[in-house]
């Protein structure tokens, strides 16, 4: 599975860095997205989610006021993801409505790393 992370930064101690590294170590293909960075986690950075050819999940590490704009960008993708994931502390009714109306699953206010670990534990 391929996961694009909007707001990707490899700054030690930040949640986005911990989660990105965790997903890479878990075997996911992680695509960092950030308009001002060239490389994150030793990977090429996409300046916008619209530049990503395809991914299964978009994980958002941005403040809630930016969610609707990123939802619009996701809808402009040629190959849309099946899920738009807003990290813990982030929710946006407007983004949720935009995406769900187009058949994209939306997760709000949940950490993808915590949920992944929980699912692994319940499966074992």
Q: Where are each of the predicted segments found?
A:
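NAD(P)-binding Rossmann-fold cofactor-contacting core
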Residues: 13-14, 20-41
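Short hydrophobic/aromatic-enriched beta-strand-loop microsegments
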Residues: 81-85, 103-110
């Amino acid at each position: 599975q391929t996961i694009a992370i909007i707001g990707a930064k490899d700054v030690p101690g930040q949640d986005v860095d911990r989660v990105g590294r965790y997903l890479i170590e878990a075997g996911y293909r992680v695509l960092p997205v950030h308009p001002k960075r060239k490389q994150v986690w030793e990977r090429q950075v996409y300046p916008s989610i619209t530049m990503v050819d395809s991914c299964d999940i978009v994980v958002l590490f941005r403040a809630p006021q930016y969610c609707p704009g990123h939802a619009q960008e996701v809808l402009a993708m040629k190959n849309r993801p099946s899920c738009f994931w807003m990290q813990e502390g982030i929710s946006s009714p407007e983004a949720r409505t935009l995406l769900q109306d187009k058949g994209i699953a939306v997760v709000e206010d949940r950490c993808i790393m915590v949920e992944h670990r929980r699912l692994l534990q319940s499966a074992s």
